[in-house]
């Protein structure tokens, strides 16, 4: 786990608690905050925060605006912050509705090899970019693909394996 992310997660949690938000209780379906997602571009250092809330009213809540302002004030590398609504009785992390509450871009960027990826709040992307690069390089060496070979990269999120192997 990355120390920057650990510190930022604590900071986010502290700000939410200070603003009076309660953690979600799955047993009685009560509380405000279901999850906190923090993504950090390994090569770029760009940070995205996604706060998953249980109530639509929290998408435009004054206390939440205060939390966002305090986080941005204390952390220079935050590129964007999103609120995600998940009020469904489900074990899925993210809901369908996403609202951007800070930043101009709707994504952060990172690289695997020579390829640049644009990572949005709901994108599936490798969590450990450094290890993914090692794994993909090992895979490329083992496959020994030729220029006219065809590779299918099915059910693969953004397709980072196929993209890496295409060069």
Protein language model features and the residues they cover:
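Accessory RNA-recognition modules of RNA-modification enzymes
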Residues: 1-167
């Amino acid at each position: 786990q990355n120390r920057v992310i650990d510190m930022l997660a604590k900071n986010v949690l502290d700000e939410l608690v200070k603003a009076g938000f309660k953690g979600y209780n799955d047993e009685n379906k009560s509380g405000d905050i279901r999850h906190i997602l923090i993504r950090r571009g390994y090569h770029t250092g760009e940070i995205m925060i996604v706060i998953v809330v249980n109530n639509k009213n929290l998408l435009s809540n004054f206390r939440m605006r205060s939390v966002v302002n305090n986080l941005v004030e204390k952390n220079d590398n935050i590129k964007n912050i999103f609120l995600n609504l998940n009020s469904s009785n489900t074990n899925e992390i993210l809901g369908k509705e996403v609202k951007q509450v800070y930043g101009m871009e709707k994504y952060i960027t990172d690289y695997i090899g020579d390829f640049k990826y644009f990572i949005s709040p709901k994108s599936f992307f490798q969590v450990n970019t450094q290890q993914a690069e090692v794994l993909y390089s090992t895979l490329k060496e083992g496959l020994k693909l030729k220029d006219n070979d065809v590779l299918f990269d099915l059910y693969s999120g953004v397709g980072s394996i196929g993209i890496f192997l295409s060069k």
